[in-house]
């Protein structure tokens, strides 16, 4: 008998750290967590701080914090002043020079929340990739989450980068987002943009598919319990199906004359529709950043200008957009000191 004197191979610090990060725990950390948790913490903390204490008086001429009397719907972390351009507004940068209060007054907190928020979303996507790899499933969760990331990055970062400054990005607040929607309509005619139309079709179509799928499964559950509530009859370890795909197919074939017969294709379609809606709307926002125009039906505008009795919903919307620009711009951009004389303000044909 020979006694072995070989010692087990030593493990480096990287292997030890890798094991610790990937350990099975209540809240998975992983390598992606090194990006996700700090950035998400700082973004959410920055937003809570801004909506609680920080004014927008110096950037927008507005009260935007709980301290000033705003509520949950009207509080916001507002975009930096237009004069700041596309500066990263670092606390130690030339604008603030290390003065924390001045940094808040200039809108530095918005850049802080936007950039950390973007990296937090990317970290969450990487988290889904990492966990899918570890437990051996496909990465479609992460691929689908690219939709919300595309929307956030295009709306909060790429759109203002195409405009004159961060000022024209949405501020982080409920009413602030509504203001941004009105701005997009008035200055870009966003609702007539085909990419917006595809986005609406994708999001509402995804909601419709989700509702149809849910009720179809509920309608075709096997009668495997004694109670009216069927939830308790389900066992997560059961081998047999819990609902009848054949019956569902028969039902929708009679309703529409066509139905899904392949569960895999059905669920891919449910993934594809809303994610494609998010992607297409993001492409449209990038177009707006470059000031690309939506559909222009010039012939209708010319005829409406020549014929007081001719008006379409399109020409009416064009006048509404002119009104939005004329009355929104002086309030939205007080630093420009816009003054529009009465004769240039839009009027409907009926006037």
Curated annotation (Swiss-Prot):
Name the domain of life this protein comes from.
Viruses
Similarity section: Belongs to the reaction center PufL/M/PsbA/D family.
Q: What is its EC number?
A: 1.10.3.9
Quick one: which residues bind Fe cation? 213, 267
Keyword annotations for this protein? Chlorophyll, Chromophore, Electron transport, Host membrane, Host thylakoid, Iron, Magnesium, Membrane, Metal-binding, Oxidoreductase, Photosynthesis, Photosystem II, Transmembrane, Transmembrane helix, Transport
Principal cellular location given in the protein's record: host cell
| Residues involved in chlorophyll a ChlzD2 binding | 116
Transmembrane portions of the chain: 39-59, 123-139, 151-164, 206-226, 277-293
Q: Which residues bind pheophytin a?
A: 128, 141
Q: Which GO terms describe its biological process?
A: photosynthetic electron transport in photosystem II
Q: Where located?
A: Host cellular thylakoid membrane
Pfam families registered for this protein in UniProt: Photo_RC
> What functional role does this protein have?
Photosystem II (PSII) is a light-driven water:plastoquinone oxidoreductase that uses light energy to abstract electrons from H(2)O, generating O(2) and a proton gradient subsequently used for ATP formation. It consists of a core antenna complex that captures photons, and an electron transfer chain that converts photonic excitation into a charge separation. The D1/D2 (PsbA/PsbD) reaction center heterodimer binds P680, the primary electron donor of PSII as well as several subsequent electron acceptors. D2 is needed for assembly of a stable PSII complex.
Q: Which GO terms describe its cellular component?
A: host thylakoid membrane; membrane
What does the Swiss-Prot or TrEMBL cofactor note state? The D1/D2 heterodimer binds P680, chlorophylls that are the primary electron donor of PSII, and subsequent electron acceptors. It shares a non-heme iron and each subunit binds pheophytin, quinone, additional chlorophylls, carotenoids and lipids. There is also a Cl(-1) ion associated with D1 and D2, which is required for oxygen evolution. The PSII complex binds additional chlorophylls, carotenoids and specific lipids.
The name this protein carries in UniProt is Photosystem II D2 protein
The residues listed in the UniProt record as binding chlorophyll a PD2, with positions renumbered to this chain, are 196
Please report the record's description of how this protein sits within the membrane. Multi-pass membrane protein
A Gene Ontology molecular function term for this protein is:
chlorophyll binding
Residues that bind a plastoquinone, according to the entry?
213, 260
The record describes its quaternary structure and partners as: PSII is composed of 1 copy each of membrane proteins PsbA, PsbB, PsbC, PsbD, PsbE, PsbF, PsbH, PsbI, PsbJ, PsbK, PsbL, PsbM, PsbT, PsbX, PsbY, PsbZ, Psb30/Ycf12, peripheral proteins PsbO, CyanoQ (PsbQ), PsbU, PsbV and a large number of cofactors. It forms dimeric complexes.
